[in-house]
């Protein structure tokens, strides 16, 4: 970030231009939906060099590295910083603990003493100690000191572990630690969503650590897939989602460990050193009371009814509770040792806490055990000692702001600062989530208890909580409760971008938005002093009454202007109620408050970005939307007026306008020069107009009719020209053409751009060039006359705001400002949506579920409220049928979520489980009557009986009638929630409207919601009967939609649970049963909060990562690997071991290791990536599924065939749960599975998967695509191995036909296929002869066996690599020969001794070879290289050159890096 600032400061061009895209790298990726580059999933290396966006060249991706001399120096400086940091590396020290062998550990000088402390608490032999100090030469080391600052600490130093006396706090920490050790193997915390633990099943699937497995031989492979994995399987079982849950875990070491009821120690015992008492029941049923004193733990003589604190006989005093329990109970000793062994065998990534809590939507039935510490955790009184810092609670605001103030000049400082920001932020999110749940559960006292429940506010643990309702009619003008519900989310977007811009001296509040049990809670840190005075006294900037009284403040203007340059916010003036003009640089409702700590805070950032006119009802004279938008049915009046455009859209729009500006100016300047040369004064005017015309036409495909329409009315030449030159139509072809055109023009802040503008201004024809710039500015709607300046006024359409507009015809007039906001909205509809659809056609980053789809839309700046329009576009394209299904499911689930929110608010807490199960029944099955309680035979259903005893008397006829009258209408308003109850903690117990809900009423509401919110008509055509027209089917349940949109109930259930926080019981659900509901109240296990927050970034790591990506795109794999490894080190430094970005980085490193010829290293790294993705993204997240696929490939390359198949089966199973079988990724998985099955001789199974993959490839890529050719070839290959040469010939002919058509007759692939056809024909002839011979002569003995050579593992691996898009570098034999000659020639020139041919690749200068490889890679034919060759592969480039039999293309490893090993 700092680097980018320096860079932008040097710009000589207008400052806005300089800021236009440089900061984009920093700000864009901070959202909740993680962005491109490091955060996104399809990294550029895997998709396409231009993945950074249509206009971003590979050089720009390197975060300014290729910018110019000074930037390169900065980059070098930064790399030197890192190297220096990494060189301060390790040395070894000895640690001596009492009663344990001395331990040697490698430490880094940057580490804190506390990290050694933590290491000892994790190790098997020392984990039972918590209360100890570390001493060096008799001096106690400070826990928070860095090792490099400790005198006398060096290589070989001996650190002693010294047991310290306990205090009350230390004793409690020790007991908690012991309890954590005893339940460390218990997955209950992960299911219950506590303590940042989450699930992982990788080692259950692979049966242990992959790296420790032996290679499997072909004969010993068990590879039959379960039935539900097979293509075309109907059922989607839920139990395999969490394998191994039914197995019995480790034996229990203790029955009970809890604090004793004799606590606290009475006065006399305190004076004897007693700190607390514990109660233990051992497995042998001994009941013991234990005293904790300052010297340790001992058994006392108390019983359940008599207090006797004297030590028992025989007395043991142990410093560690574990030692004492091992003395008392032999079972404990044995079981604890077993547990420890198991615990330390687990991969560290299975144990480390995640930064944010990940919840799981299914859980098995868990046994509820006695646990006093858990009980104590639920009460907020324990806040004091849970935070291991002095004082009762943490001052969150002070911590959050102090970390931002840390210095950031050097790399080590920035790392320290970012680590501190991240740590405090993740702690704050955890605390805020707990607090919000406590508020809704009714466990926190409001600060205004006398008021109505909706208007109550809360403070807990120094965090302020408010509810998402329109209190005191604050949002009355903007949409009431609907606006109040959306405002916190918009405010969070504002906090996100201002934190990302990171202007020194400008502070935002810690903000978390939590949706829990139907309520939206906003948690914020508290500005010092704000509670001591009224709001209108504290606000020094902005307005508290939506623009009636407006204040400004010079310091705020300065700070917000600095941020506004990056965020494209325009400084503007408005009138207050005294008719004074007040200058602002934000929306009116953004408030500035100077806290008691002297810091400048901004809050209420709900309108940071300009409004979206496509969803505003504006007065008719405004002509709000363009032609294109009107054709699509806009404007749609939304239920609130807080619809804003996304930051990503504004970035794209500005970049697009800048392109137009540069083309316009360049064309006109050429015209000027030409005119001067020809000295034809008379024709000058015409030439200029012609040039102008040409420029507009050049920009038209990218831009369309976005020139200000009003200019034309004013009769301005430029406006006329612009409108004449516009082209209609928003076809995807145009979008593609625009993207192509865009690549040739420099970016707004690139060096070329600056030079171009400078040359315009400083050229000889000063006046002409000024005129050129002026016209270009006018054509693109710039707000300055002689400068490219596109910024947005967020208040242009705010009701009740009066703008100062002194010069209505000036460049920066209000009319121009409004036009820009309209143009941006039009740009979204006309350009972004079509180009999104067009981009989806190549299926490179095919989303699998609503979450990944939303992420893709957000990256393009498309809000989810446009999803209805996106669905309409997708419906027209057959190849995107799968995406249409995903988008429709997302719409339906979101509509259901809106209704569910209101539904839960009307539900009494005691009926919560019953109400949720009833809603799911109405949503996913056909439920005709209202709620029917189901008596479960199991004893577990106590709550079901409770609900019947006290809850809604659904059986009573009278009541049912009443509720039927009231039901159905309540949820119609969705998030705005019609008819909400006045209280939220416990609604009155006769509140049972929910029981009247039926499938029919729910689906009527869902359709209503889809129309109102997304303008989407949910209709299904009934097939026409003879002689009758087809008519729309009645949608009164989900059933008609399943076939029409190819929806899948299990996918809808998963999506709904993840969005609403509902956790259901892990079991099979019978959706089709008519006589019994699919869900009962016993199936609803829990409701979790859904948490939204910002994601602080590791900016230096991000820059290293993007630079690494650029190197890889340029072909410098080794350099790229180094940079990305460095990025991973920095990420670990900032985020700790667990984070989605770390997983991203690991995946990239694994792929690079593999491409560079080290499959074993790739396997080790990818295993970590899978574990991490399961832990931080979720076990069934699409990212995790793709990680499984990569791991399977690397397993196969390491000859772990069984494991590879298990992993692919897992990936395929998860994908079918998430999105069903109709998806491009399934085609790839099926091809992979079939190839491996083919390798182990399971030809029939292999063929089933292959045929399915072929069908999908034809559907998505068209019948004549190269992918389909490969599929046909694979089918033919398998059929030939089965002896079915006739079918094989038919399929191989298809391959040949495609290659001939696409690549030409002389292409290597076509000739290979032709060779294959000849081979198959021969085989078929031989077979026929054998059969004739057998029929004639040897009827009695039957057919002789057909000898078919099975494929070698090497050729299968090559094929796997090819279909997974891993190209080692495909070089034809001829090219290899040339390549060798070229290297030899260069070496001879350099006077080096050349190697003998055939001795493997010739050594050459790394850079030269990389350069040549890059050239050959660029020559790679149309993308799908493969080798069809059943002999063993030869190794190395030189041998491949000589190996031309059958004309096969050799997939050689990039020779300079290292040749691929033989498999």
From Swiss-Prot:
Q: Where in the cell is it found?
A: Cytoplasm
Which InterPro entries does the UniProt entry name for this protein?
Answer: CLU-central, CLU_dom, CLU_N, CLU_prot, GSKIP_dom_sf, TPR-like_helical_dom_sf
Region annotation (Disordered) ranges? 1-79, 684-753, 942-988, 1387-1463
The keyword Cytoplasm is assigned to this record: yes
Q: What domain of life does the UniProt record list for this protein's source?
A: Eukaryota
Composition bias of kind Basic and acidic residues appears in: 703-731
What keywords are annotated for this sequence in UniProt?
A: Cytoplasm
State where composition is biased (Low complexity). 10-22, 692-702, 1438-1456
Q: Give one Pfam hit by family name.
A: TPR_10
Q: Which residues form the Clu domain?
A: 374-616
Q: Name one GO biological process term.
A: mitochondrion organization
Query: GO molecular function, one example?
Result: mRNA binding
Gene3D superfamilies in UniProt: Hypothetical protein (hspc210) (3.30.2280.10), Tetratricopeptide repeat domain (1.25.40.10)
* Compositional bias per record (Gly residues), positions renumbered to this chain: 965-980
What CDD domains does the record point to? CLU-central
**Which residue intervals are annotated with compositional bias (Basic residues) in the record?**
955-964
What is the recorded function of this protein according to its Swiss-Prot or TrEMBL entry? mRNA-binding protein involved in proper cytoplasmic distribution of mitochondria.
Instruction: State what protein this is by name.
Output: Clustered mitochondria protein homolog
Record the organism. Answer: Anopheles gambiae (African malaria mosquito)
């Amino acid at each position: 970030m700092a680097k980018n600032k320096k860079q932008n400061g040097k710009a000589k061009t207008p400052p806005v231009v300089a800021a236009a895209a440089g900061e984009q790298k920093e700000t864009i990726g901070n959202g909740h939906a993680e962005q491109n580059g490091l955060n996104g999933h399809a990294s550029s290396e895997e998709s396409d060099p231009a993945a950074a966006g249509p206009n971003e060249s590979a050089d720009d991706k390197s975060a300014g590295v290729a910018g110019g001399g000074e930037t390169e120096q900065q980059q070098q400086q930064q790399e030197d910083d890192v190297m220096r940091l990494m060189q301060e590396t390790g040395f070894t020290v000895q640690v001596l603990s009492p009663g344990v062998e001395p331990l040697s550990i490698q430490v880094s000088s940057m580490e804190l003493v506390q990290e050694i402390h933590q290491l000892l608490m994790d190790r098997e032999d020392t984990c039972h100690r918590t209360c100890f100090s570390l001493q060096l030469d008799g001096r106690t080391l400070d826990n928070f000191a860095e090792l490099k600052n400790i005198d006398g600490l060096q290589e070989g130093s001996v650190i002693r572990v010294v047991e310290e006396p306990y205090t009350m706090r230390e004793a409690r920490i020790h007991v908690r630690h012991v309890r954590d050790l005893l339940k460390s193997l218990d997955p209950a915390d992960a299911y219950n969503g506590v303590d940042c633990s989450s699930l992982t099943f990788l080692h259950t699937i692979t049966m242990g650590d992959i790296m420790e497995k032996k290679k499997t031989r072909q004969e010993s492979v068990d590879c039959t897939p379960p039935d539900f994995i097979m293509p075309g399987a109907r059922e989607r079982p839920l139990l395999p989602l969490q394998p191994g849950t039914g197995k019995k875990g480790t034996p229990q070491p203790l029955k009970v460990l809890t604090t004793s009821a004799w606590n606290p120690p009475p006065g006399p015992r305190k004076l004897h050193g007693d700190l607390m008492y514990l109660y233990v029941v051992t497995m042998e049923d001994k009941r013991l009371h234990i005293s904790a004193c300052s010297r340790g733990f001992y058994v006392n003589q108390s019983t359940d009814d008599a207090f006797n604190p004297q030590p028992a006989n025989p007395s043991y005093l142990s410093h560690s509770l574990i030692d004492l329990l091992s003395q008392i109970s032999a079972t404990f000793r044995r079981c604890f040792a077993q547990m420890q062994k198991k615990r330390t065998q687990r991969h560290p990534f299975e144990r480390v806490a995640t930064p944010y809590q990940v919840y799981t939507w299914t859980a098995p039935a868990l046994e509820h055990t006695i646990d006093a510490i858990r009980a104590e955790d639920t009460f907020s009184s324990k806040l004091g000692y849970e935070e291991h810092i002095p004082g009762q609670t943490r001052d969150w605001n002070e911590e959050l702001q102090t970390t931002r103030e840390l210095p950031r000049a050097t790399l080590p400082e920035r790392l320290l600062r970012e680590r501190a920001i991240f740590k405090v932020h993740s702690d704050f999110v955890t605390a805020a989530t707990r607090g919000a749940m406590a508020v809704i559960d009714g466990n926190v006292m409001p600060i205004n208890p006398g008021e109505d429940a909706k208007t109550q506010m809360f403070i807990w643990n120094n965090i302020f909580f408010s509810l998402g309702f329109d209190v005191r009619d604050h949002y009355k003008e903007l949409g009431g409760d609907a606006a109040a519900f959306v405002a916190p989310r918009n405010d969070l977007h504002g906090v996100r971008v201002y934190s990302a811009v990171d202007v020194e001296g400008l502070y935002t509040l810690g903000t978390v938005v939590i949706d829990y049990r139907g309520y939206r809670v906003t948690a914020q840190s508290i500005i010092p002093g704000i509670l001591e005075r009224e709001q209108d006294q504290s606000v020094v900037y902005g307005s508290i009454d939506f623009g009636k009284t407006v204040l400004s403040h010079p310091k705020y203007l300065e700070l917000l202007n600095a941020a506004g340059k990056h965020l494209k916010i325009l400084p503007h003036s408005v009138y207050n109620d005294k008719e004074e003009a007040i200058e602002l640089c934000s929306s009116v409702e953004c408030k500035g408050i100077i806290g008691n700590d002297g810091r400048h805070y901004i809050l209420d950032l709900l309108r940071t970005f300009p409004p979206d006119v496509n969803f505003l009802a504006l007065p008719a004279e405004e002509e709000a939307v363009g032609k294109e938008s009107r054709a699509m049915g806009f404007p749609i009046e939304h239920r609130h007026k807080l619809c804003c455009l996304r930051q990503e859209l504004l970035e794209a729009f500005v970049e697009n306008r800048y392109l137009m500006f540069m083309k316009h100016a360049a064309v006109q300047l050429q015209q000027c020069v030409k005119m001067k040369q020809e000295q034809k004064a008379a024709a000058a005017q015409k030439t200029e107009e012609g040039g102008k015309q040409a420029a507009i036409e050049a920009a038209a495909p990218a831009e369309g009719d976005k020139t200000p329409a009003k200019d034309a009315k004013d009769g301005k030449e430029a406006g006329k020209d612009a409108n004449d030159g516009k082209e209609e139509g928003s076809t995807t072809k145009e979008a593609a053409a625009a993207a192509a055109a865009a690549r040739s023009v420099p970016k707004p802040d690139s060096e070329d751009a600056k030079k171009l503008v400078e040359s315009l201004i400083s050229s000889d024809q000063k006046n002409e060039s000024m005129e050129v710039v002026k016209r270009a500015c006018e054509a693109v709607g710039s707000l300055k006359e002689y400068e490219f300046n596109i910024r947005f006024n967020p208040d242009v359409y705010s009701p009740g705001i009066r703008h100062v507009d002194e010069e209505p015809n000036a460049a920066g007039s209000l009319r121009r400002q409004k036009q820009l906001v309209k143009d941006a909205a039009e740009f979204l509809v006309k350009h972004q949506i079509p180009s999104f659809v067009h981009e989806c056609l190549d299926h490179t980053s095919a989303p699998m579920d609503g979450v990944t789809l939303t992420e893709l839309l957000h990256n393009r700046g498309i809000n989810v409220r446009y999803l209805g329009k996106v669905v309409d576009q997708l419906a027209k394209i057959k190849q995107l049928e799968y995406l249409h299904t995903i988008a429709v499911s997302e719409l339906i689930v979101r509509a259901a979520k809106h209704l569910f929110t209101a539904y839960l608010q009307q539900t009494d807490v005691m009926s919560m489980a019953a109400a949720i199960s009833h809603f799911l029944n109405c949503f996913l099955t056909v439920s005709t009557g209202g709620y029917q309680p189901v008596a479960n035979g199991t004893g577990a259903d106590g709550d079901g009986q409770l609900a019947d005893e006290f809850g809604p008397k659904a059986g009573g006829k009278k009541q049912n009638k009443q509720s039927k009258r009231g039901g159905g209408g309540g949820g119609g308003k969705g998030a705005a929630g019609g008819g909400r109850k006045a209280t939220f903690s416990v609604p009155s117990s006769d509140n049972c409207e929910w029981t009247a809900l039926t499938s029919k009423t729910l689906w009527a509401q869902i359709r209503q919601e889809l129309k109102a919110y997304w303008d989407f008509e949910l209709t299904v055509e009934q097939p026409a009967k003879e002689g009758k027209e087809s008519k729309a089917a009645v949608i009164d349940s989900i059933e008609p939609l399943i076939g029409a949109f190819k929806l899948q109930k299990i996918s809808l259930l998963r999506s709904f649970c993840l969005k609403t926080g509902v956790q259901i019981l892990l079991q099979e659900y019978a959706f089709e049963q008519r006589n019994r509901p699919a869900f009962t109240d016993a199936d609803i296990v829990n409701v979790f909060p859904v948490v939204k927050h910002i994601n602080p970034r590791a900016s230096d790591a991000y820059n290293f990562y993007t630079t690494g990506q650029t190197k890889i795109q340029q072909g410098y794999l080794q350099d790229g690997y180094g940079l990305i490894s460095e990025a991973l080190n920095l990420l670990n430094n900032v985020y700790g071991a667990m984070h989605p970005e770390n997983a991203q980085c690991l995946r990239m490193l694994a792929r690079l290791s593999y491409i560079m010829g080290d499959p074993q290293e790739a396997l080790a790294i990818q295993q970590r990536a899978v574990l991490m993705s399961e832990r931080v993204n979720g076990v069934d997240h699409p990212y995790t599924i793709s990680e499984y696929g990569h791991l399977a490939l690397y397993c196969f390359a390491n000859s772990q065939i069984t494991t590879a198949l298990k992993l692919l089966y897992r990936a395929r199973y998860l994908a079918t749960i998430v999105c069903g079988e109709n998806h491009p990724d399934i085609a790839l998985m099926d091809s992979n599975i079939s190839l491996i099955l083919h390798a182990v001789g399971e030809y029939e199974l292999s063929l089933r998967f292959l045929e399915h993959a072929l069908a999908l490839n034809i559907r998505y890529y068209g019948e004549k695509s190269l992918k389909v050719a490969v599929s046909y070839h694979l089918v033919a290959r398998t059929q030939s191995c089965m002896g079915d040469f006739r079918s094989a010939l038919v399929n191989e002919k298809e391959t040949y036909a495609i290659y001939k058509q696409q690549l030409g007759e002389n292409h290597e692939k076509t000739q290979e296929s032709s060779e294959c056809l000849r081979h198959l024909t021969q085989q078929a002839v031989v077979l026929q002869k054998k059969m004739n011979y057998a029929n004639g002569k040897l009827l009695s003995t039957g057919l002789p066996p057909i000898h078919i050579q099975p494929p070698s593992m090497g050729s299968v691996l090559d094929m796997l690599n090819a279909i997974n898009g891993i190209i080692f570098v495909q070089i034809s034999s001829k090219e290899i020969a040339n390549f060798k000659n070229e290297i030899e020639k260069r070496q001879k020139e350099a006077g080096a001794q050349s190697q003998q041919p055939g001795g493997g690749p010739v050594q050459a200068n790394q850079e030269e070879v990389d350069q040549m490889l890059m050239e050959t890679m660029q020559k790679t034919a149309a993308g799908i290289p493969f080798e069809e060759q059943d002999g063993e592969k030869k190794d190395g480039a030189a041998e491949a050159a000589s190996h031309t039999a059958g004309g096969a293309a050799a997939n050689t490893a990039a020779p300079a890096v290292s040749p691929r090993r033989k498999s």
